[in-house]
Amino acid sequence: MLVKKLAGKGGGRESGSEDPRPLGQRCAGTMPSCTALATLLSVVAVAFCFYLGVKTNDLQARIAALESAKGTPSFHPLSDTVDELKAMVQEKVERLLAQKSYEHMAKIRTAREAPLECNCPAGPPGKRGKRGRRGESGPPGQPGPQGPPGPKGDKGEQGDQGPRMVFPKINHGFLSADQQLIKRRLIKGDQGQAGPPGPPGPPGPRGPPGDTGKDGPRGMPGVPGEPGKPGEQGLMGPLGPPGQKGSIGAPGTPGMDGQKGEPGSPGAAGQSGLPGPKGEPGKEGEKGDAGENGPKGDTGEKGDPGSSAAGIKGEPGESGRPGQKGEPGLPGLPGLPGIKGEPGFIGPQGEPGLPGLPGTKGDRGEAGPPGRGERGDPGAPGPKGKQGESGARGPKGSKGDRGDKGDSGALGPRGPPGQKGDPGATEIIDYNGNLHEALQRITTLTVTGPPGPPGPQGLQGPKGEQGSPGIPGVDGEQGLKGSKGDMGDPGVPGEKGGLGLPGLPGANGVKGEKGDTGLPGPQGPSIIGPPGPPGPHGPPGPMGPHGLPGPKGASGLDGKPGSRGADGPIGPHGPAGPKGERGEKGAMGEPGPRGPYGLPGKDGEPGLDGFPGPRGEKGDLGEKGEKGFRGVKGEKGEPGQPGLDGLDAPCQLGPDGLPMPGCWQK
């Protein structure tokens, strides 16, 4: 079949025709494929066998590990020897013997270590409490979303009759909806009444510039202008002479915590300290509590009576197995705190380290609040300029957009370093571990420093709102630009300013170099504290192995007489005794119970009217009532009167919806 299938794949031969090649050549062509297939199957079988061997070995290792973890010895008859079998059987027999002997032993109940606190379960839930008082009214909530559209209104009244057509006999049905233009040209009604003025439209686009108007009349001379704005910042002047030595400045605000420095190199070995005084001998410890008595052993069996002759001395018995190690006891209570040592001597002050490298430039800070400078003196009036020619009046410009806020100018260069200040106060503040009190004492030092340098110039304030248009003045002649005035004399130095605001915390400086190692301080006196109290008793250890039966005990002494027995049952009643003498008269009895109510009395006469009582106090405010239902929609009102005619020019509306004031006067 294989030969036929291979032969049937030929292009020009039919499926039913046979291959004309001999049988040897045909089989030789299929041998390589069969060999490759057999080789592939062999490789797959070998790989599968290897995989099964690895998995079996892994499974065997896991079973052995599980048996060793659970403590159940595995039984391998091929590898175990006779000695191992004996040891295994002996161990099982001993285990069974110990289990049986433990079952027949007297049960000893250990003392229960119950805690003093109650560990009872939670009780049933209580009854629901009374309703609390009404709380205060909360703040008004946020405005809710817009409600759904209201119901459709009532049908309007019928409109007035429209104008008559010009051609009433013409049927306009032939006109389609797309020929509205023809309708408007053929059917033109009378002019309707003027409608109400519409709302002011949006401002129109900017118109083209108008023609140059005629020269106006010559105006009056203009009002002197306002003093000019301060000029740009001038060049930096030469450095002045160094100022006088300033007083001690106030302590600055604590700076930001610097970054944690790298661990320093180990210091040099200090000088050996003086030997401390010999400590006093410790106090004698308290005597420990007596241990609990061990469980009493079982009574041994009665021995056989011994012979009168002395018995043979037996061999000494084997020593018992050592008991298991008890669990470690709980840690003892912490010892009493030691006596506070005397403060050590203050070491000499180390030499100041070298100044650190300047720090990197920090990020740009946020803009400060705008400064408020004092108003300067009015400048001297300049010379009167010549009257210029009147210029043509330009068109009115549109209102420009508000400009963006400009960036603050850069700070000036850093000034030269000042002279070295006086050394700070060397007051030693012993805070005794209370850092807060130490900081309070630092802040209470009354040291006033010189006033801080003037702050940088504030940013330009925002542009104010547009003022109302003023009275149009007469255009004066444009004067010539005056020459630059001479520099004025320096002003009188002002009074001493107040204390400046504390500056912003500076950027983190570069880590300074390591200072020299200070001299070792003197060694403080060594004080040995008293020994701590003994720790609590540890928990009782586990019960030891069962002891061997003890020897026969001696005959006991006679017991003590027992306690008195319980009373016996009551005997039968005896015969009746003789009649007694007559008794004395008894005492008077207690009053009897209250009798029934009497009949109601007659109605009394009406009494006099009483005086009017005082006016009662004002009652509390009642609770807020529930929200009422929505009212019925009212009837439609009468149509309003026609409004006024619209304005010629659209005016800008204000926030209240009305035109801006003064718009009609333009």
UniProtKB/Swiss-Prot annotation:
A biological-process GO annotation: axonogenesis involved in innervation
Keyword Transmembrane listed: yes
Quaternary structure and interacting proteins, as annotated: Forms homodimers and homotrimers. Binds to the fibrillized forms of amyloid-beta protein 40 (beta-APP40) and amyloid-betad protein 42 (beta-APP42). Found associated with beta-APP42 more frequently than with beta-APP40.
Protein name: Collagen alpha-1(XXV) chain
A family per Pfam: Collagen
Gene expressing this chain: Col25a1
Keyword vocabulary terms for this entry: Amyloid, Collagen, Glycoprotein, Heparin-binding, Hydroxylation, Membrane, Repeat, Signal-anchor, Transmembrane, Transmembrane helix
Any one GO MF annotation of this record: amyloid-beta binding
Sequence ranges of Basic and acidic residues compositional bias: 11-21, 280-290, 361-377, 398-407, 615-638
Interaction with amyloid-beta peptide as annotated region, ranges: 181-188
Region of interest called Disordered, as start-end residue ranges on this chain: 1-24, 116-168, 189-428, 445-666
Residues with site note (Cleavage): 112-113
Residues annotated as signal peptide: none
Superkingdom in the source lineage: Eukaryota
